[in-house]
UniProtKB/Swiss-Prot annotation:
Disulphides: 130-134
GO MF annotations in UniProt: RNA 7-methylguanosine cap binding; RNA trimethylguanosine cap binding; translation initiation factor activity
Alphabetized Pfam families for the sequence: IF4E
Disruption outcome: RNAi-mediated knockdown increases lifespan. Lifespan is further increased in an age-1 hx546, daf-2 e1370, clk-1 qm30 or eat-2 ad465 mutant background.
InterPro entries linked: TIF_eIF4e-like, TIF_eIF_4E, TIF_eIF_4E_CS
Assigned protein family: Belongs to the eukaryotic initiation factor 4E family.
Keywords linked to the UniProt accession: Disulfide bond, Initiation factor, Protein biosynthesis, RNA-binding, Translation regulation
Protein's job: Recognizes and binds the 7-methylguanosine-containing mRNA cap during an early step in the initiation of protein synthesis and facilitates ribosome binding by inducing the unwinding of the mRNAs secondary structures. All 5 eIF4E proteins bind monomethyl cap structures. Only ife-1, ife-2 and ife-5 bind trimethyl cap structures which result from trans-splicing. Translation of trimethyl cap structure mRNAs may be regulated by intracellular redox state; disulfide bonds change the width and depth of the cap-binding cavity determining selectivity to mRNA caps.
Protein name as it appears in the record: Eukaryotic translation initiation factor 4E-2
Subunit (UniProt): eIF4F is a multi-subunit complex, the composition of which varies with external and internal environmental conditions. It is composed of at least eIF4A, eIF4E and eIF4G. eIF4E is also known to interact with other partners.
One of the record's GO cellular component terms: eukaryotic translation initiation factor 4F complex
Gene Ontology biological-process annotations: determination of adult lifespan; embryo development ending in birth or egg hatching; negative regulation of response to oxidative stress; positive regulation of translation; translational initiation
Amino acid sequence: MSEEPVAAPGTISHPVYKLKRNWTWWYLNDERNKSWEERLKNVKTFSSVGEFWALHDSIKPPSGLNPPSDYNVFRDGIEPMWEVPQNQNGGRWLITIEKGRTPEIMDTIWTEILMAMIGEQFSDDIESLCGIVCNVRGKGSKISVWTTNSADDGANLRIGGVLKQVLNNASMIHQRPLYDVLRYEDHESCQKKTSSGVKAKHAIYAVEPREEKAPVPVSTETPATPAT
């Protein structure tokens, strides 16, 4: 039997600063005997910083969920599924979290991106951003940021650049790398293939790989004898 992620309300109060837009937190539980639609629960729509932190601090972090479960936080009015109009032509920036990594890594990535998203750190490109998904799985989890138009390379690359900056800053604070690479995939390709078989449209590395310099050719010719 799946447990709901909501814990008993705490006593910590948070300042109420209004957000520029409302966001809805969704939870997909691990009851595999039910349909996907039956498993998906609307947890809460929040419209202020205080409401966000009150919710964030009162439920389990992603690492505390039973696999296979999902957390989704999307702009209010957008459901966390490929089929809705805002998502059907979109794509995602994907971060893969290998099974051997510590649980805190996933929780940190999730919270850092959430704060950037609701805090409008993506500037005008926030209009191209639909939400964030955390897929908790036993063999390795994923966190992805969904955008509404996979063909809008400019907006998608700028969003990826902000994600890199946010996560690299957090990596320095936590004194350990949080990710290796951000991969951008379109939803249509993901539906047709497994994630490992999807070719990324874009890739952004935490540390850009160094270009291997071609070795300087060594001449095997015998130098000419200088004239006397």
